[in-house]
Amino acid sequence: SAASDVYKRQNFAQYLNMLDHCTMITGRRDLYKTNGEDVNQQIDEIKSTMGNNHPKVLFIRTAASSVKAKGSAGSVCGEMLSDLGCVNIADSDKSMLDDLSLESIVAADPDYIFVTTQGNDTQAAMKSINNLLTDNAAWNSLRAVKEGKYYVLDKKLYNIKPNARWGTAYKQLADILKQ
């Protein structure tokens, strides 16, 4: 849409900027407070509970035809994980962004693995990741897998955009990371 071309909303700061402009245009500054400032305060409170823990994470977006690691920049979940103090293994191994291999994942051995789907066919998207990664015996050697820290996340919150649910999205991730 035209609005999405003008307003990038990959992270909460960009969402706040868009909300600021839209509520100025509409004259509904009360909505900026409710949906912007109040949510920003909620997110800041969540971030303040994270302490000095900086877990290594892998964030994967899977679709029917592809499985891609995503870095901290340019994806909703990647940016949130970074905000929460995580170290994304794809940030230090850029080859993962182009060619995700189980060998590189095993070498980095992340503490957590997060997956979100893309597209309408969630079943086909999960089949893609199973074929590439999870069906391989080496997958089960990963610390995150052994410790039950492999999570499939809601694409509406972590791939598309959480919009009014930014606070919820941050809280769910923080709760997982504090387990």
Residue ranges with predicted function:
Residues 13-27, 115-179:
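Structured C-terminal subdomain patch of bacterial secreted/periplasmic proteins
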Residues 31-84:
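Basic- and aromatic-lined ligand-binding clefts that recognize polyanionic substrates
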Residues 1, 12, 16-23, 36, ...:
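Extracytoplasmic/secreted envelope proteins and their assembly/folding machinery
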Residues 8-10, 60-63, 92-93, 116-118, ...:
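Active-site-proximal beta-strand/loop segments in catalytic clefts of secreted hydrolases
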Residues 8-15, 28-32, 36, 70-74, ...:
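Solvent-exposed, acidic/flexible segments
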Residues 64-109, 115:
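Flexible, glycine-rich surface segments
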Residues 53-56, 109-112, 146-149:
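Loop/turn elements at helix/coil->beta-strand transitions in domains of secreted/extracellular proteins
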